[in-house]
Every structure is written in structure tokens, then in C-alpha cells.
């Protein structure tokens, strides 16, 4: 046997080795011509010979985007072009760039260019080339764990994510106790903060090459979405689609999911469950970017994006084609928004399916006033138009249940030195969609509707156009509620005709810059969060809209609200805050990426009491895991509310056990003793019945004798509670 050390080069049989493939790859062309510089283009228009110069000029201009065009030959036969041509580029790199840019490009509605290198012709024509297509190899289906397993937690606990430095971990909430970790902490799990999908099914992380989805009990990796340098993401309402955005344009390649039609685009829409690329979009030049760039209807049947003087609405079920095959032309359109729920319009209530509603607005021009519109889909019918004058901006605020939409109209005086706000509230469930107008003397900065209710809160300030002192608290917090009718006190979710909103209370001299409602309604947190500029310290105020005590903050009484401040927290450094899905707990935290002092988080209950506080070095982010909507019917919810006292005993016991370990051990011990006694009693009963035919624990019937045989005796006992002596003037 020949060893490797004794092997010599002259002993290798070189003549038996086939070098034909290497010779073809590295052969030197006669005359120094490199055929990789030449392109063969198919799919060009067949034009008369007289129009060849025009066609050559158009194609030269197109291919010059990839590099300098040295020569272009367009064959002509019988007075017409043959539909293909040959192009010589200045370099191999320019030719490859042209293939990437224009292979598959639509020249017009009838012509799509197919671009190949001239050397490809030899490869495709060789005997070794496989000309017959084969079915692609479909990878085996990889089953995943139950993606909503966290909802099966016996104690109904919620999960949250903590990010510290480059470490990320998921935890179970245990109120005041140390939270339980889900798996191990992961290093560099995401380049940025992680995000949950709207219903909590997926956890999404950022990476250099795109986005990754995670799920299941142990947060296993599910899918990867290739989009280099991705900076933003969004998920559609039903979690069907993932939207990713990168500032760098897409460059198609063999190892990417992008085709030639995606060249230069920056927005991708993916199927979140399968990981397939559904659609890519470009961004119009000089466009004002308003995130999210792609917005979806509540049921993911339609999506839309803003363009210059047009609104593009896509029919998702029709492979993301434009609705009606064309853009919705709107001169000067500034913004749009889909209703978060389906709307039962009065003229359409006989139909079972609710209506998809969309709102948008256009600014003032020389010929027409500013207008806000409500449009139904898919018929694009305008069901309401609100005319506005002297407008500087309009913001759209949808009610969570889509019972109302508020157009926040920021107006100005004719001199444009003073700004103020009008609120135009459209009542979508009433006949002809009436509009309630609330005129305010100050400018609204923030507005938030109560979830599952009809009340709202605003933060505003006087804006006279002058210089402001950032050290002086100048903001107003205003609380609004619908007026209360004396004849019928209907459910708060439905407003009778002509019902109006009234100002319940104004709190002045505030730095407040954020409003956060509990998802369950009733409680609202008005906050001053650190923004790194003017605000250096944070504060937090909790308000109860249904306070049951005697004294309230109400300035008017004929409203469906009993407002009271229940807690005030100040001298903090919060930069962010978020409620959990139940609406029981609010987390406020200080992020190291925004502020360097006292980084960490605090969990408050809805009454403003601190449940857990933890200072964490280099703390970055806190995220509650959302929950899907309840599957209970209205009747089942009503039954649960009716038996709430019965259930609350069990919940209070669980909370007590969580808060006091000694009490928990005592309760568990008593439960075990009671269970043992019940078991012993049943065993004794069965033994006596089987051995002695003796039944224990007999139930004796009550005495049915005539009640007249009994005499009822009443005993009255008097007790002196207080004795006083008082001198009385005599009339004698």
C-alpha cells in the first residue's frame, strides 16, 4: 500500500482526468474578445425598420443605468425588427449589473425583457445542459409546538420580556415575587428591542439579515425573513402578514427570495406562518414617511399605502392586486386610516357582515376647503364628508370598537399666529353618521379613547405663537364623558340620538405628555415621561372614571362619569409605559438607551400601588405579551360578571397565597387535612354499610306536627347605649 509520503507527482495519471469544464471556464477568446461583455436581449418590441433609431435610443438610455453601452445591434428582417437584440457593455461587471436590473423587467404592458450573457448561449446549447424541468424538492413539514400554550397557564398568569444589555429573557408575572423565567436567558437574541405580534402568538427579533419569528412553550425558532438591514417591522391585525422596512433598496440575487420586479423596493410583505414573500413595494421619491407605511383593514382583506395624490388600496384575497385595478385618485391626500373593527352602518344592518371603513383627509387649496372623508370598501363609496376651514393639520383617532371616529382638527386664526383645536366626532352607529363638534380654545397635543367605553381624555396647551418657558407647566388635562339622560340610562357602549359629550374636569399646570388607558377601561394613567429634551423627570397620575366614593372631581354631574384621582407618583425617570392585556397592571420603565439614571421597571396595579420594583443595570426594554380577544359570548360574560363575588373569593385567596408564603403553606396544609378527612369519612361510610348494613349520617326529616302546638315567646332586651344630663330652665 502506497503511503502519502511516498506518493510522487509523476505517479499521478493526469491523462485520465477530464479538464474540459475548466478549459471552457478559463479559455482565452481569440482576438482578446470577452463574450461576458455581450448581452442577448429577448422580448423587445417588434417595430418597423423606420423606428429602429427610436427603439435603440430608448433601450440605450435604459441599459445605461447599469454602465456604458458600447454598441447595440437590432436585427431587422422583412422591414421589421425580430424582437431581440445584442448589446456590448463596457465591462463584465456592467453586463452582470444589467442582467440583475433588467432580466424580467416589464418594458410596457405587452413586453417583458429577458436578458442573458452571450456566454450563456453556449451553456444552454451544450449537450450537458439539462433542458427538462423537474419538480422542486419540497422540504418536509416541520411541526411546531402549540403556539398559544401560554394561555393554558393554570393560574391565568401573563408573560413579559425583559431586555438588559445584550441579554433577553421571557418571564411569568408573579406580582411582588421574583418572576419565573421561561427557559434560559439568551445573549444577542435581537439587535434591537423584540416585539410581539398583536395577539401574542409570535415573538419577533431583528438581525443583520432580516427578522426571525419565535413561538411555542420554549420560544423555538419558527421562520426567517430575509431582508438585510431591516429597521422597522409591523404585523397585520389578524397576524397573517409581517411588514418589514429597510432604508437600503433591495438587490435581487440567486440566493435571495427577491425577483427582478423587487429591484429597488424597500418594503416587504411576508406570510407570517409560512415565511413566503407575498409582495414588495417601493417608496415614491421625496415621500413623507408615516409609519406604518402599509396599513391593513381589521380583517386583513385589504391593505393600503399613501402615494402622491393617490391612495393605493390592494385586494389581498386577489393576490395583492389593486382594488378595481386602479389607484384611488385623491388630490393632495395627507393621511388615511382603517377602522379597527367592522362597522354596522344603519343602511347596512340587515347584512350579517360588518362594513370595512376607511378615513382620510385632504388639505385646503385655492379652490376648495379642507375635507375629511369616510369611505366604505370594496365599493369605495363616500358615506360622510366633513368640511373644515383654516386647518393646519388633521389627526384621525378611532374608537377601539369603531363606534366613533374623531377628526382632531388643528386650526389657526387668519393671522396664523394662534392655534386651537376642534374635535369632529362621527357617530358611526347612528343614522346618516351625525357629527358632534367640540370647540376648544387650546391646541390638543394628545387624545385617547376609553377602550370598550365612550369617554376620552386630552392633553392640550394654549398656543399663541410666542416663546415658551419649558420649565413652566403649561399643559391642560381634560376629561370628557357623554351626558347622562334622565329618562333612560342606556349602556355606555351605545349612545342615543343627540347625546353630547361634556367636559367633566380640567387639570391645569401639568407637564403631562402621555395618556394610557387600561385595556379594560375605567382607569386611565396620565403621565409625564422623560423625553431626553425638555422633560428630565417623570410623574404618573392614576384616575378612576367610575369612582364609588362620595367626593369626586366632577365639575358637572349630569355625565356618565364619577372622576377621582386615586394615585400620584413623582420624582421618577420613566421613559416608557405599557398596560398588560387584562388592564390590571401598568409597567413604567426607564430605558438605558434613552436615559442613564435609575434604569429598571416598576409594575403598578390599576389603583397606582407599586406591586414590584426592580432597578436593573443597563435595562433596555419591557414588553407585556398580548392576549387574543376573549372567545366568550356576551351571555357568558354577563354570567361571569353576575358571579364575580363568588369568583373573587378564589382570586383573593390566590393573591394572598402569592403575597405571603407562610399563609400559602397554611392554606395548603388545611386543604390537605380537609381532603384527608373527607376521604376517611367516605371510606368509613362504605365500610359500615357493607359490614353492618348501617347507614351513618342519616338525614332526619323535620317535625311536621301542627304548628299550633307550639307557643311563640318573644323576649325584648333593652340596653342603654348613652346617657346624658342636661339642665332645663324652669318656667315657674
Swiss-Prot record:
Region (Sufficient for interaction with HCR1 and TIF32) location: 1-94
Keyword Disulfide bond attached: no
GO annotation (BP), single: formation of cytoplasmic translation initiation complex
A Gene Ontology cellular-component term: eukaryotic translation initiation factor 3 complex
Region (Sufficient for interaction with PIC8), start-end ranges: 1-219
InterPro entries hit by this protein: EIF3B, eIF3B_RRM, Nucleotide-bd_a/b_plait_sf, RBD_domain_sf, RRM_dom, TIF_beta_prop-like, WD40/YVTN_repeat-like_dom_sf
All copies of domain RRM, residue ranges: 37-120
Function: RNA-binding component of the eukaryotic translation initiation factor 3 (eIF-3) complex, which is involved in protein synthesis of a specialized repertoire of mRNAs and, together with other initiation factors, stimulates binding of mRNA and methionyl-tRNAi to the 40S ribosome. The eIF-3 complex specifically targets and initiates translation of a subset of mRNAs involved in cell proliferation.
Similarity comment: family membership: Belongs to the eIF-3 subunit B family.
Assembly with partners or alone: Component of the eukaryotic translation initiation factor 3 (eIF-3) complex.
HAMAP family: eIF3b
Name this polypeptide is given: Eukaryotic translation initiation factor 3 subunit B
Name of the gene: PRT1
